[in-house]
Amino acid sequence: MSRVVVSVIGQDRTGIVAGISKVLAENNANILDISQTIMDNLFAMIMLVDISNAKVDFATLKKELEKAGEELGVQVIVQHEDIFKYMHRI
């Protein structure tokens, strides 16, 4: 299984979850876990996504998600799960 972590941060607005999820669904990427919160109008979301059966490669999916983030006015960071874990280990 090939998994990536998608992090989204920015000012809260309608459609962020829908916009990011739409890109994943269109590319046959499966959301395994999702957590999101809003703190004083700041939106933060993290998703664990299985891209094993995705229609596009990692680089293409990353670009599409980043483009969707720009359109939504949020920052999107996409990392392979192992890199994310390495960067956030204690």
Swiss-Prot record:
Belongs to the UPF0237 family. Gene3D superfamilies: 3.30.70.260. SUPFAM superfamilies: ACT-like. One of its GO terms (cellular component) is cytosol. PROSITE patterns: ACT (PS51671). GO terms for biological process: DNA-templated transcription. Residues 5-79 form the ACT domain. InterPro entries: ACT-like_dom_sf (IPR045865), ACT_dom (IPR002912), UPF0237/GcvR_regulator (IPR050990), UPF0237_ACT (IPR022986). Pfam families: ACT_6. This is UPF0237 protein MJ1558.
